[in-house]
């Protein structure tokens, strides 16, 4: 939420020491959108963690006015936190991995809303072909359907609009994925974790 982020920036810039580096963990808002509000845009950079229980990647994404000397400092911090730092050289909503992930999720959503295949068969196809433990809909349940909806509901292409509408029906029923016990699958024992899911 951009307004809330701007309000926090006012508090931080008054209380933080002058040499303090400000970072944001936002997933889709660009640091340049609120860098000026930090009061120190040259000391502001995106430092984005993925789910630390599953991933060790931290994205470092400077905005055009970030002091380049911050990059090695943040890379070193990432390594000290047992993360693998990746540098996003140009601002991009979704960084690197989330951009690729949303392409996968978008394709899976298009297949489902176009009635090309079922949730289970879309996931099976992905899991078998790439030797993965879950497919796109299992991933969506892990991310949270509400989170996925926040990303997709402003997209304007026909497939994204249809998929956002489908996600909203789940959200309206309180089915947000793994965190609520049900999304595209039921938890704690979703079908894709059963040995007979892929036969």
Residue spans for each PLM region:
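Histidine-centered active-site/metal-ligand motif
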Residues: 1, 48, 132
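Single conserved hydrophobic/aromatic residue that forms the stacking wall/gate
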Residues: 1-12
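Helix-to-beta-strand junctions that scaffold the AdoMet/dcAdoMet cofactor pocket
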Residues: 16-17
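Rossmann-fold dinucleotide-binding core
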Residues: 20-89
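Short phosphate-engaging motifs
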Residues: 30, 104, 147
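NAD(P)-dependent Rossmann-like dehydrogenase/reductase catalytic/cofactor-binding core
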Residues: 69-73, 79-90, 109, 113-114, ...
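Conserved short loop/turn motifs at secondary-structure junctions
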Residues: 92-95
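Structural/interface elements that position substrates and couple domains in central-metabolism enzymes
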Residues: 97, 101-107
């Amino acid at each position: 939420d951009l307004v809330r982020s701007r309000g926090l920036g006012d508090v931080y810039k008054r209380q933080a020491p002058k040499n303090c580096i400000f970072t944001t963990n936002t997933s889709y808002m660009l640091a340049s959108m609120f860098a000026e509000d930090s009061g120190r845009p040259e000391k502001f950079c995106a430092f984005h963690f993925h789910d630390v229980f599953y991933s060790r990647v931290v994205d470092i994404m400077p905005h055009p006015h970030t002091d380049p000397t911050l990059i090695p400092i943040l890379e070193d911090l990432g390594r000290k936190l047992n993360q693998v730092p990746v540098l996003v050289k140009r601002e991009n909503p979704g960084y690197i991995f989330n951009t690729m992930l949303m392409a996968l999720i978008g394709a899976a959503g298009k297949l489902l809303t176009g009635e090309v295949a079922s949730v289970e068969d879309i996931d099976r196809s992905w899991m078998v072909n790439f030797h993965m433990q879950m497919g796109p809909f299992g991933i969506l349940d892990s991310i949270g359907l509400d989170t996925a909806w926040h990303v997709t509901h402003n997209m304007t292409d026909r497939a994204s609009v249809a998929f956002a509408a489908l996600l909203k029906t789940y959200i309206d029923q309180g089915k947000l994925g793994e965190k609520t016990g049900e999304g595209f699958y039921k938890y704690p024992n979703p079908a894709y974790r059963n040995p007979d899911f892929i036969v």
